[in-house]
């Protein structure tokens, strides 16, 4: 578990005092670095080795002073030696390292001076031993506080997707398939994130695979079975003589590890793939990428059939900002100088509830929750300027405010786990600000993700309409001519009394079902849809029904733009976003695009019609007769 930043700073001060007079490179350098890692509550033995042999350029061989594979390379010199030369020496080791071993940071020191090179950000930092306590935040990657930077097409996200897909394929080839395989991969995703984001001790899971399983992989399946059982067992109920490598794992709960799974069979190749997954830095992967991870292991035919279009965070924000986020920030600006009103606003945030009735692997719910927690932190910064004894008591927003329905079991499992992981990342963000480590373990609350067909179950069974605040998502993009037999039956049921309902695209079923659900409430809805619902024949069928029988009013709309994603074989489609409710509002917003790939230009209008332009709620219906004699 991660130490608080206050504790880390205190340890850094004590470290500096203890080592302020040391000068000899070899005599005490190893003790120096053991103590350095202890500043962050990390055992150096667990993550890094001294004098790591490596082949240099040509036929020469060398030894790295301290090496944490895939993360950190340290070169240590006697006090006063040339540190720039030491940096060159460190870089010269790179050709002898495997790709997965290449470090993200180089750290050079002579006891007195520290030089840290962040190779991914291309940034350098220099400070003295006495200034270390002021710069401990630079070593968040050691403590487990690494921040996630959202980068479209981030290579590490693509690498993670490829590796998980590769592991999926080799397991499936052995006959390990279906529910067991899917649930196993979801558990593995949690374990990978957990050890890189301070839910577990650093490298706890990786070390378990490296040191407690045979190189031929023959015992990995049984070791996983033991591990899953331990993760699902409270400390006071565990065996007294439990192996130390297992006893170190925390109690997770949340039912994630409760179900008994068949034991998978591994070999040496599969073990290597598993370890390659472990060597990635999962702290740099947003849980929102789980959609991409899921899509990357589906075949093309299956993906098209499900209409599984996963998308970028930037596009998701196009929906959630006008739906609720912009309004919440406007209210925050109005009340932030009045602590009483701000506290009431904070309490209100914890009562908001969100439903994605076609949630897939949770992308929309994840980003919505993340943005809610970021706003909560801004509130907490103002309300709690003094030290806080227990930050868990001031964090009121939680994952159980978020609800989803998903027809695919694997995707629903991923969504559930991803919500826990984004919650943990947000807790780390708050921990960093208040200098106090906070983790929600064992898991007591969870997002309410239901594995079911959204068009076949009453949404009231998921969450009562008098409790819900917002509905959001991107229901499947499947045209009316591409529906399978079951989907056609669903459409016939939903549009039973709607004339010509058979020509409507699949997504329109969510519009009608949402319109029925929100009657007599203040619930606001926003869906991403193919632009066919705002042009041509479908407008006269769908919107006539919604306007006439359910009193629907469009509150905001994004006109046609290109909706693409970052997943393998990404699916690009022309879409619109429509925000609506069963009540009217002023200052409606239209987001216009000069072309489908340009940025949006916003304008405020009095009314938005179903063609998503300013105008009255008039629809053009299909006619079989001419308007006048000719």
Name every feature range the model reports, one short phrase each.
Residues 22, 56-62, 79, 83, ...:
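Signature of N6-adenine DNA methyltransferases within the class I
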Residues 2-16, 130-371, 401, 405-414, ...:
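Preference for the N-terminal adenyl/adenosyl cofactor-binding alpha/beta module
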Residues 1-105, 121-122, 144-147:
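A short, conserved, highly charged catalytic patch centered on acidic carboxylates
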Residues 47-50, 204-208, 331-350, 372-400, ...:
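Flexible phosphate/Mg2+-sensing switch loops adjacent to catalytic phosphate-binding sites
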Residues 6, 26-34, 186, 291, ...:
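Short amphipathic alpha-helical segments
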Residues 69, 101, 347, 352, ...:
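Structured loop/turn residues at beta-strand edges in well-structured enzyme cores
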Residues 56-61, 209-225, 340-350, 390-395, ...:
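Short, mixed-charge aromatic SLiMs
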């Amino acid at each position: 578990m991660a130490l608080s930043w206050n504790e880390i700073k205190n340890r850094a001060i004590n470290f500096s005092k203890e080592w302020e007079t040391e000068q000899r490179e070899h005599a005490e350098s190893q003790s120096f670095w053991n103590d350095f890692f202890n500043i962050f509550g990390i055992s150096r033995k667990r993550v890094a080795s001294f004098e790591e042999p490596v082949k240099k350029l040509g036929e020469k061989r060398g030894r790295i002073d301290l090496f944490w594979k895939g993360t950190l390379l340290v070169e240590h010199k006697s006090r006063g030696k040339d540190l720039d030369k030491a940096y060159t020496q460190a870089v010269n080791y790179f050709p002898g390292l495997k790709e997965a071993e290449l470090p993200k940071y180089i750290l050079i020191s002579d006891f007195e001076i520290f030089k840290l090179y962040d190779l991914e950000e291309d940034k350098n930092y220099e400070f003295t031993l006495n200034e270390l306590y002021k710069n401990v935040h630079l070593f968040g990657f050691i403590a487990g506080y690494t921040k996630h930077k959202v980068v479209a097409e981030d290579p590490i996200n693509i690498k993670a997707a490829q590796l998980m897909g590769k592991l999926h394929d080799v397991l499936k080839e052995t006959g390990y398939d279906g529910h067991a395989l899917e649930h196993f991969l979801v558990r593995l995703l949690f374990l990978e994130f957990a050890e890189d984001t301070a839910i577990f001790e650093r490298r706890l899971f990786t070390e378990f695979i490296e040191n407690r399983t045979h190189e031929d992989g023959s015992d990995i399946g049984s070791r996983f079975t033991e591990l899953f059982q331990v993760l699902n067992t409270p400390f006071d109920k565990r065996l007294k003589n439990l192996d130390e490598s297992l006893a170190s794992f925390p109690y997770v709960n949340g039912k994630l590890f409760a179900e008994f799974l068949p034991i998978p069979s591994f070999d040496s190749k599969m073990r290597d793939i598993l370890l390659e997954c472990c060597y990635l830095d999962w702290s740099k992967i947003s849980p929102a990428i789980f959609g991409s991870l899921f899509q990357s292991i589906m075949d093309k035919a299956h993906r098209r059939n499900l209409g599984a279009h996963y998308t970028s965070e930037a596009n998701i924000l196009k929906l959630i900002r006008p739906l609720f986020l912009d309004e919440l920030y406007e209210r925050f600006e109005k009340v932030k100088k009045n602590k009483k009103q701000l506290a009431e606003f904070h309490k209100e945030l914890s009562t908001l509830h969100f439903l994605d009735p076609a949630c897939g692997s949770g992308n929309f719910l994840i980003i919505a929750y993340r943005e809610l927690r970021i706003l909560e932190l801004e509130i907490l910064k103002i309300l709690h300027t003094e030290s806080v004894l227990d930050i868990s008591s001031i964090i009121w927003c939680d994952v159980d405010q978020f609800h989803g329905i998903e027809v695919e079991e694997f995707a629903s499992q991923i969504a559930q786990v991803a919500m826990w992981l984004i919650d943990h990342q947000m807790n780390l963000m708050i921990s960093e600000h208040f200098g106090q480590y906070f983790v929600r373990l064992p898991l007591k609350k969870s997002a309410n993700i239901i594995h079911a067909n959204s068009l076949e179950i009453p949404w009231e069974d998921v969450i009562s309409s008098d409790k819900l605040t917002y509905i959001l998502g991107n229901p499947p993009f499947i045209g009316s001519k591409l529906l399978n037999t079951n989907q056609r039956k669903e459409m016939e049921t939903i549009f039973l009394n709607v004339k010509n309902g058979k020509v409507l695209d699949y997504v329109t079923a969510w519009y009608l079902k949402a319109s029925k659900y929100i009657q007599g409430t203040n619930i606001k809805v926003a869906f991403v849809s193919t632009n066919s619902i705002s042009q041509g024949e479908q407008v006269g069928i769908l919107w006539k029904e919604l306007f006439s029988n359910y009193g629907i009013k469009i509150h905001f709309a994004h006109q046609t733009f290109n909706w693409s994603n970052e997943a393998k074989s990404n699916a690009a489609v022309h879409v619109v976003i429509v925000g609506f409710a069963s009540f009217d509002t002023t200052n409606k917003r239209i987001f216009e695009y000069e072309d489908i790939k340009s940025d949006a230009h916003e304008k405020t209008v009095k009314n938005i019609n179903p063609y998503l332009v300013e105008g009255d709620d008039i629809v053009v219906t299909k006619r079989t007769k001419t308007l006048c004699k000719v």
